[in-house]
């Protein structure tokens, strides 16, 4: 792409796929993404020896949503713990689904195709933002949870683009003109 600035200087802008893009979870993120996959490392570091149920239960206890006794008494499964987290006033929570077929793509849109495909997709983890995390990074808001959900969706989408190889880099070079020269500037002929 050839560009010209206000002073007539010409530039060449080259945009190309970045095959060595950095994992976006190494950036400054607001949400926490935890996944359990055998073939991929997706999201933030966490103890993979814990099951998804253990991680959800810990999150419920740490955020005063449920006690260990309540969880054992009600014999709650992952989906019930996720529902308790979604209904909480102090945490924004989203499931993460993956579709794996000649590559992988992830989304928080769990109920839509292809993320609800019965053979090649399934829940691989979850993302969350606590009210405390949100207020620390974004300030106090009455609609903090709605905004935190948007942040989760956006950060998961960014990770998905990285997984799918949709990362680009650019190089901006000043165009060099050789005027009125009788010799080649490279070989001097």
Task: Give, region by region, the residue ranges found by the protein language model.
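Acidic interaction surfaces
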Residues: 1-189
């Amino acid at each position: 792409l050839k560009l010209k600035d206000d002073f007539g200087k010409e530039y060449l802008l080259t945009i190309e796929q970045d095959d060595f893009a950095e994992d976006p979870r190494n950036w400054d993120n607001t949400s926490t993404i935890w996944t359990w996959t055998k073939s991929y490392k997706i999201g933030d570091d966490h103890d993979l020896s814990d099951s998804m149920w253990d991680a959800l239960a810990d999150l419920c206890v740490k955020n005063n949503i449920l006690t260990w006794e309540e969880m054992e008494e009600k014999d709650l499964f992952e989906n019930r713990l996720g529902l308790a987290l979604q209904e909480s006033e102090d945490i924004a929570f989203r499931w993460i689904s993956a579709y794996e077929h000649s590559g992988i793509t992830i989304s928080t849109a769990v109920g839509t195709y292809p993320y609800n495909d019965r053979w090649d997709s399934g829940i691989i983890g979850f993302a969350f933002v606590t009210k405390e995390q949100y207020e620390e990074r974004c300030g106090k808001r009455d609609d903090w949870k709605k905004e935190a959900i948007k942040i989760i969706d956006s950060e998961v989408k960014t990770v998905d683009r990285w997984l799918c190889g949709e990362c680009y880099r650019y190089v901006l070079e000043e165009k060099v003109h050789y005027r009125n020269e009788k010799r080649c500037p490279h070989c001097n002929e």
